[in-house]
Every structure is written in C-alpha cells, then in structure tokens.
From Swiss-Prot:
Protein name: Tetraacyldisaccharide 4'-kinase
Annotated Gene Ontology cellular component terms: plasma membrane
Membrane-spanning residues: none
Superkingdom classification of source: Bacteria
UniProt xrefs under PANTHER family: TETRAACYLDISACCHARIDE 4'-KINASE, TETRAACYLDISACCHARIDE 4'-KINASE, MITOCHONDRIAL-RELATED
Enzyme class: transferase
Family designation: Belongs to the LpxK family.
Cross-referenced HAMAP family: LpxK
Lineage: Bacteria, Pseudomonadati, Pseudomonadota, Gammaproteobacteria, Cellvibrionales
Amino acid sequence: MSAALAKAIERRWYSRPGILWLLYPLALLFRLLSYFRRRSQTQSSVKFAVPVCIVGNIAIGGTGKTPTIIALVHALAEQGITAGVVARGYGASLAKDEVRVLDANATAAMVGDEPLLIYKRTGCVVAVGSNRVAACETLLKSHAVDVILSDDGMQHYKLGRDLELALVDGERVFGNGQLLPVGPLREHPKRLQSVNWLLVNGGSAEHVNARLQALEAINAAELSSKPNKLNKTPAPVFAQLEAVKLVNLATGKTLLLQNITELGAFVAVAGIGNPARFFKTLQSTGITGFDTFSYPDHHKFTSADFRQFDNKAIVMTEKDAVKCTPFATDAMWYVPVDLKLPQTFIADFCAQIRKVIALYN
C-alpha cells in the first residue's frame, strides 16, 4: 500500500467513512472472526507463575502505550514491586517464535524501537517476541519479577491475563467508531466493558466523555435483549504527556523546550503512530514556522533520511532517537516525554497489582 493511500484511509478512519462504507461487509466479517478467535484462544490461554497485566487498546495507531508502560514500571518500583515487560518488538530482526531478552548491547534493529526505549528509561527486564506466551516464559526463566506488563497484546488471547488497562487517544478517541477496514478499531467498543481501567491520553474530558456516553448508548441498544450482559465501561482516567526539554542525540546537551528558538531553523521528524501529537507539542511553545515530516510507525531511519535537512536542526521523538543513535550528529535533538498519571490512579493500580500478586503466593 502506498503512503498516500494509507494516509487517505486514515483520514477516513478519523472522520466520516465515506467510500469506506463499501467495505462494511468486510468489517462484519472481521468482527465475526475476531469473536471466534477470542473465544478459541481464551479457552487455551496460558497462565504463569506471576500475574500478567495487559496495557493495550482497541484501536490501531499510537495511543501512548510506551510512555504508559514506563510510568507504570516506575510507579510499581516505588512501591517495591518489580515488573518485567514483554513486547512484540515491531521492526526487530527476530526469527519466527524467537524471543530476545534485552541487554546493554541491544539495538533498535535487534529488538525494536519501543522495547529498547522502555529498557533504557526503566532498566527493567524486557523480553521481545511475536509469541508473547514464549516471551513471558523466557523472561521468567532468567529473571525474578513480581508481575509482567504486556506492551500491547490485548487481542493476543493466548496470553492469559489477570488485569487489563485500555488506552484511548483523548483527541482521536475511537475515530469513526467502525471496525477494520472501515474504521480504526480492532475490536468492538463494548470490549472496553471488560477491562479494569480506561486510561485516556490527552484531549479534553468533555470531548472524551461525550464519545463514551454515545458508546454506552450503542452498547445498551445492542445488548437490550441480553440484560444480564449489560456492563458499563470503566470511568475514564485522564493523563497528560509532559515534555519540558530537548536532548542532543550526539552530545547529551539539554535545552528547555521553551527555548527551542535557540536551535535556529529546524525541522520536526516523527515516525510514530500519531505524528500530529508530537508536532502539536512543539507548536505549544508558540513556534509554528517549521516544516514537519511524517514517516510510518516504526520507520527504520537511516542517515540518508536526513540528508535533505542540511544546515537545519532536526527535532524528533525519543522513540525515533533510539534508532538514530548509530549515526547521530550534533544537529539531532529529541524530546523525551513523561506521562503524568493521577495519584489516585497510581494508588489504585498498585493496590490491585499487589492484591493479584498475593493470590499467586
């Protein structure tokens, strides 16, 4: 699929479906297949010696899973709870069913950009592999952890789970609300009724709550003939990404984001699930006169990608920066972000994790 076509489809996903309505029969088939897949895999799911908490979503695209995982690992560590992380490792050079546990020699090409970023920011044990069950088993053979956090994997039902945290992009929410390929959803929104937490990344509470109320009305109508199955989606918890500085990829020098004009002319580059969010972060400094360049999520950057930006500073995401380290120059800067979680949520999350851990001891 060409980049232009992919962008055109994505625009329809987050507006009115338009011509994509022609694919509605495929969306119905996708929903049916998803139902049977979930039912089949759940019956044969694998449990482990420690609890598993899924951190995922029901929509395609960036919802902030990586900064969320990082924040949760730190929050658990402050409570004396050791977490390990398993991830798919998109873009990693892994053979089928191969699992790799990250170490100091890991590179983005070996293990994927997101797992490497999690490892660098937290220092926790991270195992990557397309088979998350095998990843958990490998992790537990070599490391003692109290709980495993799965970066994504909500639809990987072979992986037994004790708790689930669903992430929602507070600006895009559920897009047009339709399943693939008409919309961006991997599962029907009523799936959110079975998760433990609904964490909203950014956006306004008014906008998100309005969408959630509409969702509840749709779910209630669909399940009106099955009153015993009527559940409510968990109350949303709102979190915000915070960016305060830039870091030079070659030297480690830091610069406050509010002083970004000191870079002179610069371009912004992003190869993430939702590049617009990153560009808006930079625009929040009041600077708007810079060019933006979007690449597909998990894009494998090379030095050739940056030759067109001679004589300009290059500002990128931290996720992209871990892939550019081998050819870093003084012109390259990245913006680390931290997810600021409400203290009430952190307390509840850690308490629920501790409660489940007790059941395994």
